[in-house]
């Protein structure tokens, strides 16, 4: 059933159709090649906005640093990062005055979390800069490597597994004269292949020890690696994002925990909530402003955009904020929280892979690593790159650029939101002391500002005052990209408000379709996405029914599983026809086995296997749900799995779907080619790590899984657990005396 899309819009009001103008269908753009240029752009831009600050030199690393704090007050509308400390502190004080006790309560909550968080919190998150290998790794591997190096250098605070103890190690490591690390390297040899008698290149992986002096270690500890942000829609240019290393991560986590706790208590904050909860919160603020603007008042809303939010934020400002927020707290707590902003004031940006050169005539390609940019002759580069390199050269040390001002993308989202809200908070009449007043919403760098005043002049004055107040704390509202409307129509974090939030359905478009995990998961995810959009995004019954039919069609084409009685010929059709003919109850066949589709919009919540179970032939049931079926490598499947779906905006979301284990829930095997590369050692580490975790989970199944308290190691915890379980099983008669004795014997040998 193919549909002419224009039919969908015949009776649609204009505001509901606005979402179709978004660049959301089709594949998003991905970046290829090196991110070095984008990173240099970021570094140069950041320095440009703060160029009138003071230059100093870091005594430990020798890095030149620019400090724009308390710099000149702006005289024009250009973006600038000259935040004034006293203004930031005053904004914090007013925020506390409006919300008595907010900072103290959040500090108490955070203090409790700080004392309880385990170091494995850092295994969450994707790519992390691994300072031991000087490149990105999965978070768990990077953490394991860091702890291993710490241990071999005599730092053992992290044995008990608390994050705070690991951070003590980090602090101590920075005072050490030198650190010894193990790095991987590749050897290439030309050897003759016995079978083919041809020459082949053989690679072997070596590990070697390397000593880093204090300066080199500090540079690595303060380094943020950079990557290009992928899949960004609606932009012509790509941009760089940062992946910090393990030394910085833990400290940032605690600062963000405190800031999150504050944001939860602020009605103007769009973080940390999301979805329908966020919409309700925002609608409240709008309602408040509209009810308060009596017949005599005008109310206008600015859909705001800030110029270069990250480049103009400053870690030194965050330090001032934290110092103020924690001023009544114990010394140790204040110290732990102030380290993240201090590290960020001394951060180094790693320039990535460097540049690739190719000579067409000689068919040669060569990579110029970032480390060489400081000394290479610039005649090889084009004009724009040459300018970039010239600008950045004074800042380069060992292939990293000193970047003191500015925050890289996504590092302190919560804390910067607190700063933004503190300016919105100043709009109350009791603070403005004039006829105009404002309120609004803030979510990281996105904001909406609602201004009320008796006349247009008042609105203009209110906006001007807001604009100038923001400038004082390093926030630059863009006059070109912000626009103003009568209150009732605005956009905030891609939610469109028109007397209530309009469902922006096109945001969800990319998550429709076949995910490509396996036949079982794809069917389940597909129908769950449709179900969720009927609940949350005004997907109407007729459109949902159409989406479902398109999905089934897409699914059949993807897995070549057209109905058994179809005329379409594919590689699978011969087998599927045979199955169709020998099946008595054809309605019981899964769609992926050439069966009919029994889904409609009423039964989307039921997994397909359950939907058809009663209709299946017995021998088909036996084949489909047989754990001993030799053709299937099984994962142990929980009743609920998580899929990663890509909405068009923001990060990939995790979505739950029902998982029923059948012979269709296969897991593809890993690509073998990784085994011949330098990643092999890492892969083995990762598998080792995985095995240990799985073993641990076996002893502490999630229902009873309370992490072992105290200082026992994983092994001790598992042994004591095994003893308890064995005793219970023995006393209840589930195991024999001999078995019990054997278990006890094994336990004591392990100890």
UniProtKB/Swiss-Prot annotation:
- One biological-process term from Gene Ontology? DNA-templated transcription
- Primary location: host cell
Q: What is its EC number?
A: 2.7.7.48
Question: What's one GO-annotated cellular component?
Answer: host cell cytoplasm
Task: From the Swiss-Prot or TrEMBL record, state where the protein is found.
Answer: Host nucleus; Host cytoplasm
Q: What class of enzyme is it?
A: transferase
* Motif Nuclear localization signal per record, residues: 187-195, 203-216
| Stretches for region Disordered | 54-82
UniProt keyword terms in alphabetical order: Eukaryotic host gene expression shutoff by virus, Eukaryotic host transcription shutoff by virus, Host cytoplasm, Host gene expression shutoff by virus, Host nucleus, Host-virus interaction, Inhibition of host RNA polymerase II by virus, Nucleotide-binding, Nucleotidyltransferase, Phosphoprotein, RNA-directed RNA polymerase, Transferase, Viral RNA replication, Viral transcription
Q: How does it assemble?
A: Influenza RNA polymerase is composed of three subunits: PB1, PB2 and PA. Interacts (via N-terminus) with PA (via C-terminus). Interacts (via C-terminus) with PB2 (via N-terminus); this interaction is essential for transcription initiation.
Record protein name field? RNA-directed RNA polymerase catalytic subunit
Q: What is the lineage of its organism?
A: Viruses, Riboviria, Orthornavirae, Negarnaviricota, Polyploviricotina
């Amino acid at each position: 059933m193919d549909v002419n899309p224009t039919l969908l819009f015949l009776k649609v009001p204009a505001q509901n159709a606005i979402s179709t103008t978004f660049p959301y269908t089709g594949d998003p753009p991905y970046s290829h090649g090196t991110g070095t240029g984008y990173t240099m752009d970021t570094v140069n831009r950041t320095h440009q906005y703060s160029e009138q600050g003071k230059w100093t030199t870091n005594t430990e690393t020798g890095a030149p640093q620019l400090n724009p704090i308390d710099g000149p007050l702006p005289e024009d509308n250009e973006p600038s990062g000259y935040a004034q400390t006293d203004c930031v502190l005053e904004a914090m004080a007013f925020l506390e005055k409006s919300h008595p006790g907010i900072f103290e309560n959040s500090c108490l909550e955070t203090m409790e979390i700080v004392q309880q968080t385990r170091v494995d919190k850092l295994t969450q998150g994707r790519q992390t800069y691994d300072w031991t290998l000087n490149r990105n790794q999965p978070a768990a591997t990077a953490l394991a490597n860091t702890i291993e190096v710490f241990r071999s250098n005599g730092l053992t605070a992290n044995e008990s597994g608390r994050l705070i103890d690991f951070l003590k190690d980090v602090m101590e490591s920075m005072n050490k004269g030198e650190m010894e690390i193990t790095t991987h390297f590749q050897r290439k040899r030309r050897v003759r292949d016995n079978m083919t008698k041809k020459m082949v290149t053989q690679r072997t992986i070596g590990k070697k020890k390397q000593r880093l002096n204090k300066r080199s270690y500090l540079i690595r500890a303060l380094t943020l690696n950079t990557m290009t942000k992928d899949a960004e829609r609606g932009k012509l240019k790509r941009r760089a994002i940062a992946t910090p290393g393990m030394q910085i991560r833990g400290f940032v986590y605690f600062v963000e925990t405190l800031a999150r706790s504050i944001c939860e208590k602020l009605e103007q904050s769009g973080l940390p909530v999301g979805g329908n909860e966020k919409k309700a919160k925002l609608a409240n603020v709008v309602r408040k402003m509209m009810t308060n603007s009596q017949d005599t008042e005008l109310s206008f809303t600015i859909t705001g955009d800030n110029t270069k939010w990250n480049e103009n934020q400053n870690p030194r400002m965050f330090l001032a904020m934290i110092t103020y927020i924690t001023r009544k707290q114990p010394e140790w707590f204040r110290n732990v929280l102030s380290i993240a902003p201090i590290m960020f004031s001394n951060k180094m940006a790693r320039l990535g892979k460097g540049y690739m050169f190719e000579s067409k005539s000689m068919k040669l390609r060569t990579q110029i690593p970032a480390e060489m940019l400081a000394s290479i002759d610039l005649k090889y580069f084009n004009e724009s790159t040459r300018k970039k390199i010239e600008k950045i050269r004074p800042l380069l040390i060992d292939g990293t650029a000193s970047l003191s001002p500015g925050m890289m993308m996504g590092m302190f989202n919560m804390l910067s939101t607190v700063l933004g809200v503190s300016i919105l908070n100043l709009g109350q009449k009791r603070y403005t002391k004039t006829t105009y007043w404002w309120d609004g919403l803030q979510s990281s760098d996105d904001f909406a500002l609602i201004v009320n005043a008796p006349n247009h002049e008042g609105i203009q004055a209110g906006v001007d005052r807001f604009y100038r107040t923001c400038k004082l704390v390093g926030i630059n509202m863009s006059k070109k990209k912000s626009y103003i409307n009568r209150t009732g129509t605005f956009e905030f974090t891609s939610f469109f408000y028109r007397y209530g939030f309009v469902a922006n359905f096109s945001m969800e478009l990319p998550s429709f379709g076949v995910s490509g995990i396996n036949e079982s998961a794809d069917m389940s995810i597909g129908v769950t996405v449709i179900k969720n959009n009927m609940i949350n995004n005004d997907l109407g019954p007729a459109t949902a029914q159409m989406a479902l039919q398109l999905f089934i069609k897409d699914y059949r084409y993807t897995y070549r599983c057209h109905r058994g009685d179809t005329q379409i010929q594919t590689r699978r059709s011969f087998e599927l026809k045979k199955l169709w003919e020998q099946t008595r109850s054809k309605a019981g066949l899964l769609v992926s086995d050439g069966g009919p589709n029994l889904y409609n919009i009423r039964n989307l919540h039921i997994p397909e296997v359950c939907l058809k179970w009663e209709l299946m032939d017995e021998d088909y049931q036996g084949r489909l749900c047989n754990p001993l079926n030799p053709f299937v490598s099984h994962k142990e499947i929980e009743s609920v799995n998580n899929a990663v779906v890509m909405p068009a905006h923001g990060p990939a979301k995790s979505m739950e779907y029902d998982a029923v284990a059948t012979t269709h829930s296969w897991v593809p095997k890993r690509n073998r080619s990784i085994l011949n590369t330098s990643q092999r050692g890492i892969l083995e580490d990762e598998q080792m790590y995985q095995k240990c975790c799985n073993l641990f989970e076996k002893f502490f199944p999630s229902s009873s899984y309370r992490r072992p308290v105290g200082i026992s190691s994983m092994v001790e915890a598992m042994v004591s657990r095994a003893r308890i379980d064995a005793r219970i099983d023995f006393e209840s008669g589930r195991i024999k005396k001999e078995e019990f004795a054997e278990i006890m014997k094994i336990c004591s040998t392990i100890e």
